[in-house]
Regions:
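Hydrophobic alpha-helical transmembrane segments
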Residues: 7-13, 248-252, 314-320, 445-457
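Hydrophobic alpha-helical transmembrane segments in multi-pass membrane proteins
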Residues: 14, 22, 55, 195, ...
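Well-ordered beta-strand positions enriched in small/hydrophobic/aromatic, beta-favoring residues
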Residues: 125-127, 195, 246, 352, ...
Length: 780
């Protein structure tokens, strides 16, 4: 969307668009390579026949390019040669012994905050497979795997050869509405499977690879680690992780608190190495070269070498690769005083990026990077005309006008990228409009000082100290600005992700509006854009229109989260807990509710005081409005600190606390019967599980039974009452055989059995317990 978009001088723009369209078509409608080759041959014949008709010939060429994009995407997603590990990865996990080379730096993640005590750290890296053991001998294999070791492991580096024994499995797709698609994420990186190693004993280092590419990767990893050590030596513990993220792209050094602070202040992009950092580095090298009186050719060569080297250190992230290509094109044209069209340069960088990694078309980093640059290129010339600079102006006026120009350009970029940011991250940060104008100059100074620290701090400690002091102060100021910005009342708004169809409509109309040459058409597209915004807001605020009972059993790992939506739109959440990351589960629940266009939970009922049934409730109360928190009297009797804190803090979150016992009815919808069946008043079971709340839901002659972990004495008390058939049963205690014995099966006689969590053997054991033909659905 640059000024060049309005002229026919950007032929590569059409080429890049066609190539991207081909990738999109193949990702939506996969087709074999023969289809693309056959279509290309037919189009080639048509082009030859109509080569003297420019429009037909151009259309044929663009379609051939689109076929090339589809073919490139197909090749990147194909199973590969017969020895590819992708052919061995199936939906059923399998114990495997592999040998391969580590290609990414092993990173250790601590257990998530609030996780169970037995949770251990995990160490992750990507592995290039060389051999796999089949029966009694090893066979050659190719491909990449994501390795997850369920423990902390040290002494491994990029380029090391390792022998691994673990469980080979296929990455999962999105397990919940609006959830993260791990399979798609890994496939974009060329990873086709996951190897889970249970203990450190399943990992054995056997040497290191002498392959030139592996040795180069090892050298780059060592260079990044050496740079990180220099930063730690010259900066305070508070600012060193920020400097590592800013200068070396080591965002794993940031803790969750700092990461969330930068996200909520709308400044996270300043820490993620991107085109901004590449541009600042290029500007620094350019300035130094001019001060040294280098000629245009030498200056351009210095810029290109510096930028390309930095891109390699930054692991060729999409935004970095795009910026490196743009800077290289500009630098190569400078000695000849030739300036490439911005749209052409942007299209060329897109072609290079998609040719190397076609999956980056679906990457948020690549999408936001190209969109932001397009908005920058389109808005900058117009802002300069709107707020011109005058040579007669005073220094103060010049600074004010420069600041206003920067803010207006930032406003244009923010408005264009906000829908895409909301789609990927569920968040819009208006405070970034103000903060970025202050932060960019500080980040620029920090980057330049950081280059001095990294470049000379290892050889000349004195120079490192001289540059490290100001760098530490600037980064401390950046942290303070981000902290106060994130804590401001209107810093950020968490929002449901807009639909893909709405995004296509919005950006399609926006493209037509900025490229249209006719004023009337431009006005028409702008009106359409305004209508699209209004329709999007109304659709997001409109409640679900199906007017029926809707039950969603979310994947909570080993835990439970069941969302019930009544026909009148009111909602009930039964349980909110997991043995994994409770913060992640709380966000999963909110996202699932948002996907159903539900903005609040009218009631949250916690079955009992086991952490895998209530651990996410506290975070959930802070994420979305909750009307009532419902518990049984035995919940508080458990004496657990977390349970008591939850009930103490619930009023601060705006939720009322109510006790429920057997016989109570929840009045959410007059057409839905919701009755508590257990525990009765005064019941005191020997375990928390036996005290679990059991909820019966009736609607139009159908019955649903939500059971928590009911077993032992509590279950026997239920069995003493007359039983009636259940249409949908939530298997008690995550499908445990001890809670699903024959007496329980005969008492419930379910048509369907749902399992929240459970083990890999749960389904088979339940199929033996319940009558033949009973469908059993598991979240895991």
């Amino acid at each position: 969307m640059t000024s060049e978009l309005e002229t026919p001088r950007s032929p590569l723009l059409a080429v890049a668009t066609a190539f991207a369209a081909g990738i999109t078509c193949n990702s939506c409608l996969p087709a074999p390579a023969t289809v693309y080759l056959g279509i290309s041959i037919i189009l080639g014949v048509v082009w030859w026949r109509y080569r003297h008709h420019p429009q037909v010939a151009t259309g044929c060429l663009l379609l051939v390019i689109a076929c090339g994009g589809g073919l490139r995407h197909h090749v990147s997603r194909s199973l590969g040669p017969p020895g590819s590990i992708a052919r061995r990865v199936t939906s059923t996990r399998q114990l495997s012994q592999l040998n391969g080379v580590i290609v990414t730096v092993p990173r250790t993640r601590p257990p998530p905050h609030g996780a169970a005590v037995h949770q251990r750290p995990t160490t992750r890296w990507q592995l290039r497979i060389e051999t796999i053991r089949h029966r009694f001998h090893s066979e050659p294999a190719t491909g990449r795997l994501q390795v997850i070791v369920n423990d902390r492991i040290r002494g491994l580096d990029v380029g090391d050869r390792v022998s691994l024994t673990g469980w080979l499995e296929r990455p999962s797709t999105a397990r919940n509405p609006g959830g993260f698609d791990m399979r798609c994420f890994l496939v974009r990186q060329g990873v086709c499977g996951i190897l889970v190693v249970r203990t450190v004993g399943g990992v054995r280092r056997t040497g290191f690879s002498r392959h030139s590419v592996d040795r180069f990767r090892r050298w780059l990893a060592a260079l990044r680690e050496a740079g990180n050590r220099i930063l730690v030596r010259h900066l305070s513990p508070r600012t060193a992780p920020v400097a590592a993220a800013l200068l070396l792209g080591l965002r794993d050094e940031l803790d969750d608190g700092h990461r969330n602070m930068f996200i909520r202040s709308g400044t996270m992009h300043l820490l993620a190495i991107s085109g901004l950092h590449v541009g600042l580095l290029a500007g620094l090298v350019w300035t130094l070269a001019r001060l040294l009186r280098c000629g245009p050719a030498v200056t351009s060569a210095m810029v290109v070498i510096s930028v390309c080297s930095y891109a390699l250190v930054a692991e060729l992230r999409p935004s970095v690769l795009r910026a490196a290509v743009l800077v290289t094109i500009h630098a190569l044209g400078h000695p000849r005083r030739r300036r490439a069209a911005t749209a052409n340069s942007l299209a060329l960088s897109a072609l290079i990026l998609l040719g190397i990694r076609p999956g980056d078309l679906q990457s948020p980093g690549a999408q936001l990077s190209f969109l932001a640059v397009a908005a920058l290129a389109w808005s900058a010339p117009r802002v300069i005309k709107l707020v011109p600079l005058s040579e007669a102006s005073s220094t103060v006026k010049t600074i004010v006008r420069r600041t206003l120009q920067a803010w207006l350009v930032g406003l244009a970029i923010w408005c264009v990228t906000a829908p895409l940011v909301a789609s990927w991250f569920g968040l819009v940060a208006p405070v970034g409009l103000l903060v970025n104008v202050l932060m960019i100059p500080l980040v620029s100074l920090a980057l330049w000082l950081g280059v001095l620290v990294l470049g000379f701090g290892g050889w000349f400690p004195g120079l490192g100290v001289l540059a490290g002091g100001p760098l530490d102060g600037i980064l401390g100021l950046v942290l303070e600005i981000a902290r106060h910005s994130a804590a401001s009342p209107l810093a950020f708004v968490e929002t449901p992700a807009p639909s893909t169809s709405w995004l296509l409509l919005f950006y399609g109309l926006l493209t037509l509006a900025v490229t249209s040459q006719h004023r009337r058409l431009k006005s028409l597209w702008l009106v359409g854009l305004a209508l699209a915004l209004v329709i999007g807001l109304l659709t997001a605020l409109k409640p679900p229109g199906d007017r029926t009972l809707h039950l969603s059993v979310l994947d909570a790992g080993h835990g439970g989260a069941i969302l019930l939506e009544c026909p009148n739109g009111r909602t009930l959440l039964f349980d909110a807990g997991t043995l994994g990351d409770p913060g992640r589960l709380s966000r999963t629940i909110r996202t699932a509710a948002w996907q159903r266009r539900q903005r609040r939970l009218d009631a949250v009922l916690l079955s009992h005081a086991d952490r895998d049934h209530f651990s996410a409730a506290a975070d959930l109360l802070g994420l979305m409005p909750v009307g009532s928190l419902l518990i049984s009297p035995t919940f508080l009797a458990s004496g657990q600190r977390e349970a008591l804190e939850l009930c103490t803090d619930k009023t601060r979150m705006g939720a009322s606390l109510e006790l429920v016992i057997a016989g109570d009815r929840l009045l959410l919808d007059p057409n839905v019967s919701i009755v508590v069946r257990h525990p009765p008043a005064g019941f005191a079971g020997p375990t928390d599980n036996s005290c679990s709340v059991v909820l019966e839901i009736g609607y139009r002659g159908r019955r649903i039974l939500l059971t928590g972990d009911i077993e032992d004495v509590g279950q026997r008390q239920l069995l003493d009452r007359p039983g009636t058939p259940i249409d949908i049963l939530l298997a008690p205690h995550h499908g445990s055989p001890t809670a699903n014995r024959q007496g329980w099966v005969e008492w419930t006689r379910p048509e369907w059995v749902l399992v929240s969590g459970g083990r890999t053997t749960t389904r088979k054991k339940l199929q033996q317990a319940y009558r033949a033909g009973t469908p059993i659905l598991c979240t895991r």
